[in-house]
């Protein structure tokens, strides 16, 4: 059974120009650029948490997938096991996190990398703005 709900193909091989989390507004905005120079903006709303690693100056995305909540807990079991007791992402236990994600309709967006930045965003909605 596939964990992928949908793929966002507009981001393949895009360079990341910038990203900004607005914790007060519960949002995260990422601006990317295609190889041909077109801008693609990604706007997450209803942000619960995000986790990025391997962030460098010249990040190139492989793509982004929305995955199932079960898939998220399988894929990030080790990370969550070590971090949830420190309040990341926003709960005291794995069970509480799952309940909150269900209650608040939080979706899981996994960002894969060709170079640099990768990780996930937990948010209610995502919108891509393409030219």
Range-by-range predicted roles:
Residues 1-131:
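Surface-exposed, interaction-prone regions used to assemble/regulate multi-protein complexes
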């Amino acid at each position: 059974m596939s964990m992928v709900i949908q793929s966002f193909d507009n981001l393949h091989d895009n360079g990341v120009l910038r990203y900004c989390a607005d914790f007060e507004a519960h949002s995260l905005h990422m601006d990317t650029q295609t190889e041909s120079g077109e801008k693609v903006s990604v706007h997450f709303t209803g942000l619960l948490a995000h986790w990025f690693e391997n962030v460098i100056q010249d990040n190139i995305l492989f793509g982004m997938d929305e995955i199932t909540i079960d898939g998220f807990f399988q894929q990030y079991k080790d990370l969550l096991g070590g971090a949830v007791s420190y309040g990341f992402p926003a709960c005291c236990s794995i069970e509480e996190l799952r309940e909150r994600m269900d209650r608040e309709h939080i979706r899981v967006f996994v960002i894969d990398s060709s170079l640099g930045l990768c990780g996930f965003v937990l948010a209610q909605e995502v919108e891509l703005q393409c030219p």
